[in-house]
UniProtKB/Swiss-Prot annotation:
It comes from the Bacteria. Belongs to the FliN/MopA/SpaO family. Required for surface presentation of invasion plasmid antigens. Could play a role in preserving the translocation competence of the Ipa antigens. Required for invasion and for secretion of the three Ipa proteins. Keywords: Plasmid, Virulence. InterPro entries: FliN-like_C, SpoA-like_sf, T3SS_OMP_SpaO. Pfam families: FliMN_C (PF01052). The lineage of its organism: Bacteria, Pseudomonadati, Pseudomonadota, Gammaproteobacteria, Enterobacterales. This is Surface presentation of antigens protein SpaO.
């Protein structure tokens, strides 16, 4: 169980930190101790008791349409089957950069043995926080995580065409390339060997943009072209880790990586598919599609 730092709520830095958390969850802090509600998280430390109210169900209802009809009595474990990443008895919330993980146990006596713990009760027992984002006094910028995307190509597709796509259809990859993007900016390329290992090469300049301004008379909004990107892999990586791969390390791809290509439309994830060979080129066979009709 990780120890959770207790800090003064009057500190300006703590107030800022609380506001940042509120952007992801509806969180309020109190100095009074509340019990008996699944949505109340009790933080106990040697410095005193804190209660953080996490309106989990409201967040899920707003974020995921599948939960719109759920009642407040539904257990977190039930909800986790659709949203939370399951690993044994641990559940992660993928929306947080510093992930919060839960551990479920029916041994309630654990709630009183430790001086630093974080838990809340559910119909299945006590749920503990194994890990929680903590306030840092200092941050090394080289240790911040950045999203790296191993892009394999893109296509320009009419919006109306995307609306007609169904599972099992194939989107032709119009432009094949092996570009490496960091925070959606091209920083280099990569070469994959026969062992499914990628050698990362950083470029000294990003070159000219392929986008040009085009005058277009719009008679139908569905005639607007959107850019569809096919992402072979996404990886959060620090600058230090990136330097390691650039200098002497090879990045190992999963063996079945071509079966799990992410499909993004104007930067937003809309589906997944498999890289397939077609006549005179390649395409992505859709395995899941999240575009509303």
């Amino acid at each position: 169980m990780l120890r959770i730092k207790h800090f003064d709520a009057n500190e300006k830095l703590q107030i800022l930190y609380a506001k940042q958390l509120c952007e992801r969850f509806s969180i309020q802090t109190f100095k009074n101790k509340f019990t008996g509600s699944e949505s109340l998280v009790t933080l106990t430390s040697v410095c005193g008791d804190w209660v953080i109210r996490i309106d989990t169900l409201s967040f899920l209802k707003k974020k995921y349409e599948v939960f719109s009809g759920f009642s407040t009595q539904e257990s977190l474990l039930h909800l986790s089957k659709c949203v939370f990443i399951e690993s044994s008895s641990v559940f992660s919330i993928p929306e947080l950069s510093d992930k919060i993980t839960f551990r479920i146990t029916n041994e309630i006596q654990y709630a009183t043995t430790g001086s630093h713990l974080c838990c809340f009760s559910s119909s299945l027992g006590i749920i503990y926080f194994d890990k929680m984002p903590v306030l840092r006094n200092q941050v090394s910028l080289d240790l911040l995580h950045h999203l790296l995307e191993f892009c394999l190509g893109s296509s320009n597709v009419r919006l109306a065409t995307l609306k007609r796509i169904r599972t099992g259809d194939i989107i032709i990859v119009q432009k094949l390339y092996n570009l490496l993007l960091c925070n959606q900016v091209i920083i280099g390329d990569y070469i994959v060997n026969d062992n499914n290992e990628a050698k990362i090469n950083l470029s000294e300049s990003n070159g000219e943009s392929e986008h040009t301004e085009v005058s277009l008379a719009l008679f139908n909004y569905d005639d607007i072209n959107v850019k569809v990107d096919f992402i072979l892999l996404e990886k959060n990586m620090t600058i230090n880790e990136l330097k390691m791969y650039v200098e002497n390390e090879l990045f190992k791809f999963p063996d079945d990586i071509v079966k799990h290509v992410n499909i993004k439309v104007n930067g937003s994830l809309v589906g997944h598919g498999e890289l397939v060979s077609i006549e005179d080129g390649y395409g992505i066979e859709i395995s899941s599609w999240m575009v509303k009709e």
